[in-house]
Amino acid sequence: MTDATIYYDDDAESTVLDDKTVAVLGYGSQGHAHAQNLDDSGVDVVVGLREDSSSRSAAEADGLDVATPRGAAEQADLVSVLVPDTVQPAVYEQIEDVLQPGDTLQFAHGFNIHYGQIEPSEDVNVTMVAPKSPGHLVRRNYENDEGTPGLLAVYQDPSGEAHDLGLAYAKAIGCTRAGVVETTFREETETDLFGEQAVLCGGVTSLVKTGYETLVDAGYSPEMAYFECLNELKLIVDLMYEGGNSEMWDSVSDTAEYGGLTRGDRIVDDHAREKMEEVLEEVQNGTFAREWISENQAGRPSYKQLRAAEKNHDIEAVGEDLRALFAWGDD
């Protein structure tokens, strides 16, 4: 039994948003989903976008009111900041002086609050509602009367209503249908960054590339290496998603299970664990945050170089060719 506090529809009081206007700043992956779900839930919504934003026409076509970020914040009681992390401090500077005491400033990720890139006035509520899914799935699940699990955190609560407002917002976008876990800005930020770097985005892709290279260097065909190290990963992850590691072990062959159980720890060994701990420490002590902030201030030279190298890896060309040759199912 988990010790986590999890909220569902019955725990949220939707009426706390009845007399409120919500500004959604940004209309990207999360922004479009939040704004449309809030609107469909009967919440008064205005979308904040630059005058020259390419998303303005899309938001207007979806039937939403659109203003500049500052104009939207002036109208709103709750401002949901859903532009990219790297843009948020500049956007906050545009709206800071129009936030009134008791207003709520809300985020979907804690980076800028946790690392001090945004320092709100003490008389403003600061909350986080973070769906644990890409925006298009948040929207699709809502339309299908399903939910998307999410996180809720309160950083400061001068009005005494921050928690209730965040929970009502989470319900309005469909998260409490599935369940909303209570957390903190620190916990969400640090676990999210660590998971991305050590496992989900960094660890997995490096493991896949290294496995692919090992097979190709040993004389096996790139196509077979691609299938065994990248393509089949989805099949395994789907099983883990549905029922944890045990579901996966129960579903694969005995040979695969024995081989994985006896060889897996030789790959992710004590040295890998030490490196994971180093990555976590860099997240905790702010080393990564300072590095990423400096990288953006310098115009992202390392980021661009690393991205180009990834796109030019042999596994990308092999995968593109194979995906064009096979009739893939929807799943």
From Swiss-Prot:
The record's active-site residues are: H109
* Binding site residues for NADP(+): Y27, G28, S29, Q30, R50, S53, S55, D85, T86, V87, Q88, G135
Alphabetically sorted, this entry's keywords are: Amino-acid biosynthesis, Branched-chain amino acid biosynthesis, Magnesium, Metal-binding, NADP, Oxidoreductase
Q: Which residues form the KARI C-terminal knotted domain?
A: 184-329
For this protein, what does the record note about how its cofactor is bound? Binds 2 magnesium ions per subunit.
Needed cofactors, names only, are:
Mg(2+)
Disulfide pattern: none
Q: Residue limits of the KARI N-terminal Rossmann domain? A: 4-183
Gene Ontology, cellular component aspect: cytosol
UniProt name for this protein: Ketol-acid reductoisomerase (NADP(+))
